[in-house]
Amino acid sequence: MRALITGVAGFVGKYLANHLTEQNVEVFGTSRNNEAKLPNVEMISLDIMDSQRVKKVISDIKPDYIFHLAAKSSVKDSWLNKKGTFSTNVFGTLHVLDAVRDSNLDCRILTIGSSEEYGMILPEESPVSEENQLRPMSPYGVSKASVGMLARQYVKAYGMDIIHTRTFNHIGPGQSLGFVTQDFAKQIVDIEMEKQEPIIKVGNLEAVRDFTDVRDIVQAYWLLSQYGKTGDVYNVCSGIGTRIQDVLDLLLAMANVKIDTELNPLQLRPSEVPTLIGSNKRLKDSTGWKPRIPLEKSLFEILQSYRQA
């Protein structure tokens, strides 16, 4: 059994590669970084925007599964690079779908979307199901909603085997800065090491998000590749909402020093979804998946990853 992970050198890709290896899957991974190396992964240098190269890589490997992770993943950065976000996320996906179609492969594809596709959720719609109306409120959200629509179109028009996820906030050791848990943890450790004044700069702390550990996320991706229904969309989420303020409080309680907070207007986004909590009923019913790693454990391990760096 062969699996291709695009964007394998990214945060989720590394965890997914490790999980697939544990399932005795032969793993191939693409990365823009020629130097990237992962254990038990055959690495391939690839720019997802090079459609001809994408086609050659896929036709050469002939994977049974493709996990399409290569993407621009920052909501915040999407406001600064709207064109780049849309191009990479939408046209990169098109290149993968067309490569599989043109190669006439019998291959299951997982396209990775986001809770940001839902955007403005009304109070009575929470926790949000896959049937909910999409009202994305960021360029990133629009790009991922477009990916989901393309996936559905290729299933209907060409009979391709595609599943689309709407993945909510995922966290864990190794995620890049620019995501809230990492930014908080890095500042706390810098303060502990006296590299920073004992003040954490924060954005909107009232937003409510649905957090899941990345190790639970990749298990969901694997189970969906095995048991998901072609053409369906699946929320990948814990089903539990947590205020950003509460995430910060949990991290501050783990700090070795007293720390104050200060609002940084630069960390506020032009428009922000106030509450995003998902229903994972479809995922659970289809695969038997359930999250195993509690938020507190994820946050502690993120802190420890910076302390040990």
Swiss-Prot record:
Organism, per UniProt? Aneurinibacillus thermoaerophilus
Job of this protein: Reductase that catalyzes the conversion of GDP-6-deoxy-D-mannose to GDP-4-dehydro-6-deoxy-D-mannose (GDP-D-rhamnose).
- GO MF annotations in UniProt: GDP-4-dehydro-6-deoxy-D-mannose reductase activity; oxidoreductase activity
Query: What sections of the protein cross the membrane?
Result: none
Class of this enzyme: oxidoreductase
Q: Where along the chain is substrate bound? A: S114, S115, N169, D183, R209, R269, P270, S271, E272
Query: What is this enzyme's catalytic activity, as reactions?
Result: GDP-alpha-D-rhamnose + NAD(+) = GDP-4-dehydro-alpha-D-rhamnose + NADH + H(+); GDP-alpha-D-rhamnose + NADP(+) = GDP-4-dehydro-alpha-D-rhamnose + NADPH + H(+)
Q: Which UniProt keywords apply?
A: NAD, NADP, Oxidoreductase
Question: What protein name applies here?
Answer: GDP-6-deoxy-D-mannose reductase
Instruction: List ligand-binding residues for NADP(+).
Output: F11, V12, R32, D47, I48, A71, K72, S73, Y140
Q: Looking at the record's lineage, which domain of life comes first?
A: Bacteria
